[in-house]
UniProtKB/Swiss-Prot annotation:
One of its GO terms (biological process) is translation. It comes from the Bacteria. Belongs to the universal ribosomal protein uL14 family. It holds the Pfam family Ribosomal_L14. Keywords: Ribonucleoprotein, Ribosomal protein, RNA-binding, rRNA-binding. Gene3D superfamilies: Ribosomal protein L14. Coiled coil: none annotated. This is Large ribosomal subunit protein uL14. Binds to 23S rRNA. Forms part of two intersubunit bridges in the 70S ribosome.
Length: 130
């Protein structure tokens, strides 16, 4: 559950290290963002010579949350941190690498470029008897 003033880690190599959510996109009074939601954020910490600078306002998609997500099969998925990937105007990632696992819900939000760059897609496999 991401809301205004929530600080998130950045899971790509765009140059930003930490961002702060300004607004959750997708409705006039949408309060919370979950995995796969697009937010408007401000860069709070950045490395020198990065693609984005400190204080810059960017759009980002949430890829991990501490708040658990309930899947259709009944399982709950949660992560150790809140993380996002910074997007450009065409909703493609600014960075060329993604760090850490990415939740499967990002695929349902049609961010296929992020899925293809992710080193690990958190995809729970249930034990099924044959």
């Amino acid at each position: 559950m991401i809301q205004s003033f929530t600080r998130l880690n950045v899971a790509d190599n765009s140059g930003a290290k930490e961002i702060m959510c300004i607004k959750v996109l997708g409705g006039s009074h949408k309060r919370y963002a979950s995995v796969g939601s697009v937010i408007v954020a401000s860069v709070k910490k950045a490395i020198p010579n990065g693609k984005v600078k400190r204080g810059q306002v960017v759009k980002a998609v949430v890829v991990r949350t501490k708040k658990e997500i309930q899947r259709k099969n009944g399982s709950l998925v949660r992560f150790d941190d809140n993380a996002a990937v910074i997007l450009d105007a065409k909703k493609d990632p600014v960075g060329t690498r993604i760090f850490g696992p990415v939740s499967r819900e990002v695929r349902y939000a049609n961010f296929m470029k992020i899925i293809s760059l992710a080193p690990e897609l958190y995809n729970e496999k249930r034990n099924q008897k044959k």
